[in-house]
Amino acid sequence: MTTETPLPVLELLPAVDVVNGQAVRLVQGEAGSETSYGTPLEAALNWQEQGAEWVHLVDLDAAFGRGSNAELLREVVGRLDIKVELSGGLRDDESLEKALDLGVARVNLGTAALENPEWTARAIDRFGDKIAVGLDVRGTTLAGRGWTKEGGDLWDVLARLEEAGCARYVVTDVTKDGTLQGPNVELLRKMVERTGKPVVASGGISSLEDLKVLRSLVPLGVEGAIVGKALYAGAFTLPEALDVAGRR
C-alpha cells in the first residue's frame, strides 16, 4: 500500500497593517476604507499566542508617504518572539537600515523597487535574503506608491530583479486585496514559472479552501501566504488555517 507524501508546509503570515497607531484592514489598499482592530501590539501578540511563526507588519502611513509609526513598530517587534516581515515606506538607506535594526527577519521593498532600481539592486546585494520585493499587481501592470500610481510591466520588472539576485517576492493582486474574493492562482502560477525564487502570496484569501489551493502550489515555489481580512473578519481562525497549511 502506498502512502501519499504530505505536501510541504505553507508558511502563514497574519497581517498587521498600521494606520495612525491602530491595526486596520483596508479594501483594495485604498486610504479611507480602513476598519480598525485595536492596537498593533495586541493584534501581533494575539497571532503569536495562536501559533503564528510569522507576522507581516505594515506601516501604511509610511507606505502612503503621510507619516510613520516607527516607534510603535519598534515596540511590537521587541515584544514578539516570532519572525517579522516589515513593509511600508522603505525607500532609502536610512529607512532600510532603521527597519533592519529593529531585528526583523526580513523587509519587503515595494515602491522603491519600481522607482529606484539601482538602489534596490544595491540593497539586495548588501542584505541578501533579508530583502523581499513586493510586487503589487493589477493584471500584469505594477502598482506603485500606496497602490495609487502605475509602476510598469510586471515581467519587465521581474527580469530586472532576477538579474539583481532578489531572494524572494511577495505578490499581491491589488484588485483582490481585502475583498475576500480568493487569491489570483493564475498569476501565482505564472510567477513561479518565471522565477526559481520563493513567492509569498497576498490578497483575496477568504477561506480554508483557498489555503488548500495555495498549499498545493508549494512544490512549485509558492512558499507562504499573507492572511489579513479573512482572519480579522472571522472567516476562519488562525489555528484552523495553520492546520490546513500544515503545522511543523
From Swiss-Prot:
Principal location class: cytoplasm
Pathway(s): Amino-acid biosynthesis; L-histidine biosynthesis; L-histidine from 5-phospho-alpha-D-ribose 1-diphosphate: step 4/9
Any one of the GO BP annotations: L-histidine biosynthetic process
Active site: D17, D136
Subcellular location field: Cytoplasm
Broad enzyme group: isomerase
Alphabetical list of InterPro entries matching this protein: Aldolase_TIM, His_biosynth, HisA/PriA_Actinobacteria, Isoase_HisA-like, Isoase_HisA-like_bact, RibuloseP-bd_barrel
Catalytic activity from the UniProt record: 1-(5-phospho-beta-D-ribosyl)-5-[(5-phospho-beta-D-ribosylamino)methylideneamino]imidazole-4-carboxamide = 5-[(5-phospho-1-deoxy-D-ribulos-1-ylimino)methylamino]-1-(5-phospho-beta-D-ribosyl)imidazole-4-carboxamide
Keyword Isomerase: yes
CDD domains hit by this protein: HisA (cd04732)
GO CC annotations on file: cytoplasm
GO molecular function, one term: 1-(5-phosphoribosyl)-5-[(5-phosphoribosylamino)methylideneamino]imidazole-4-carboxamide isomerase activity
Annotated Pfam families: His_biosynth (PF00977)
Listed NCBIfam families: hisA-trpF
Highest taxon above the source species: Bacteria
Family statement: Belongs to the HisA/HisF family.
EC number: 5.3.1.16
Protein name (Swiss-Prot/TrEMBL): 1-(5-phosphoribosyl)-5-[(5-phosphoribosylamino)methylideneamino] imidazole-4-carboxamide isomerase
